[in-house]
A protein has these predicted regions:
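Extracytoplasmic
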Residues: 1-52
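Boundary/entry segment of secreted carbohydrate-active catalytic domains
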Residues: 31-87, 92-95, 99
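The feature represents the first ordered module of a protein
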Residues: 98, 110-111
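Extracellular structured ligand-interaction cores
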Residues: 9, 23, 93-97, 127-131, ...
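Surface-exposed substrate-engagement region within the catalytic domains
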Residues: 4, 10, 82, 87, ...
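Short, solvent-exposed loop/turn segments at secondary-structure junctions
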Residues: 18-20, 33, 74, 101-103, ...
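Substrate-binding cleft of extracellular glycoside hydrolase catalytic domains
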Residues: 106, 112-242, 246
Length: 247
């Protein structure tokens, strides 16, 4: 990460992100230019839908030239954040971020509901780009007992701190030592595949961002290092693309 400073006098401000920060000192050093990423000419999936190919082509065309503005907003096109941005700027973000979290079986069993797919279809038909992440809950049987900050553990069941690591190990699941855990995760994937299929049937291409922020370790999919996470990522691709036919 770097900060571009113009020649002459500059003012650098440090602001809080999550409401707190720890700071010992600041060092300013010259850094070399970052290597520009070169996007592959073609998608990995040779059978990608026409809509997916058009979106990929557009993103390649604007890469390094323009910035695509986006906003996560559960309410979609007419949600609180989008209304605030439109009021302040007169413009609507080009990209809407949503979450498959509330479609996860563990959360559904605890009474959670979602209309994220409907919001995505609405936004796409209005001409926008849709991206999804997935805060993937582990099933209740893998959660610690008690509560987390007064909330039931399942409410934050994607956080490593809420998972009983003596019962759940992604490493064991991915190396074949825990077939029951593997089948359980695949059942979750099946449910999310149904939602992706709904989007595919509506001709809505999605920038899907599963297993996000894995390097931090605060989510269970990144808590045991890169190797099991990479295996799970590849498995997700194989299942969603080759088994469920989502292109």
């Amino acid at each position: 990460n770097g900060i571009y400073l113009k020649k002459g006098q500059n003012t650098v401000k440090i602001t809080m992100s999550w409401g707190y920060f720890s700071l010992d000192y600041i060092t300013i050093e010259k850094m070399s230019a970052s290597n520009a990423y070169t996007a592959a000419e073609n998608l990995v999936d040779p059978y990608a839908s026409q809509s997916t190919q058009r979106l990929y082509s557009y993103m390649k065309d604007v890469y390094g030239k323009k910035v695509i503005t986006g906003q996560y907003c559960n309410g979609g096109l007419n949600g609180t954040e989008f209304k605030a941005i439109k009021s302040a700027t007169g413009q609507t973000p080009a990209m809407l971020g949503l979450d498959f979290m509330r479609y996860t079986p563990c959360r559904v069993q605890n009474g959670d509901t979602s209309d994220a797919v409907e919001k995505a279809i609405e936004f796409s038909r209005a001409g926008g780009i849709v991206t999804f992440c997935w805060h993937w809950n582990v099933p209740d049987k893998y959660l610690l007992s008690g509560t987390d900050g007064g909330n039931p553990r399942w409410w934050g069941g994607f956080y490593t701190k809420n998972v009983d690591r003596s019962k759940f190990s992604l490493t064991k699941i991915m190396n074949g030592s825990d077939p029951d855990g593997y089948n359980t995760l695949m059942s979750d994937v099946d449910e999310i595949a149904k939602q992706l299929k709904r989007l595919s049937d509506a001709d809505v291409p999605v920038l899907f961002r599963p297993l996000h922020e894995a390097s931090g370790g605060w989510f269970w999919w990144g808590a045991e290092g890169p190797e099991p996470c990479k295996k799970l990522y590849r498995l997700l691709y194989e299942q969603l693309t080759n088994v469920y036919g989502i292109d």
